[in-house]
């Protein structure tokens, strides 16, 4: 039973990490095309190494 819970936890963390990665990729592409946000969110994409 404990192994099943650990597997669910690891799967959830991997899915959340993948979603964050794809979101940052899309945001980086948007900001590179000249898009801006009033909150300065495009400044975050300068940290991303790609």
From Swiss-Prot:
Enumerate the UniProt keywords alphabetically. Cell inner membrane, Cell membrane, Membrane, Repressor, Transcription, Transcription regulation, Transmembrane, Transmembrane helix
- One of the protein's GO biological processes: negative regulation of phosphorelay signal transduction system
- Subcellular localization, per the record? Cell inner membrane
Cell inner membrane listed as a keyword: yes
- Tree of life domain: Bacteria
Claim: Protease is one of the keywords in the record: no
Q: One Pfam family for this entry, by name?
A: MgrB
Membrane topology, from the record: Single-pass membrane protein
Q: Which residues lie on this side of the membrane: Periplasmic?
A: 28-50
Question: What is the purpose of this protein?
Answer: PhoP-regulated transcription is redox-sensitive, being activated when the periplasm becomes more reducing. MgrB acts between DsbA/DsbB and PhoP/PhoQ in this pathway. Represses PhoP/PhoQ signaling, possibly by binding to the periplasmic domain of PhoQ, altering its activity and that of downstream effector PhoP.
Q: What is this protein called?
A: PhoP/PhoQ regulator MgrB
What is the gene name? mgrB
């Amino acid at each position: 039973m404990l192994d099943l819970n650990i597997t669910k936890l690891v799967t959830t963390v991997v899915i959340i990490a993948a979603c964050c990665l794809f979101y940052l990729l899309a945001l980086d592409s948007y900001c590179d095309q000249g898009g801006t946000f009033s909150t300065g969110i495009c400044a975050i994409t300068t940290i991303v190494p790609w």
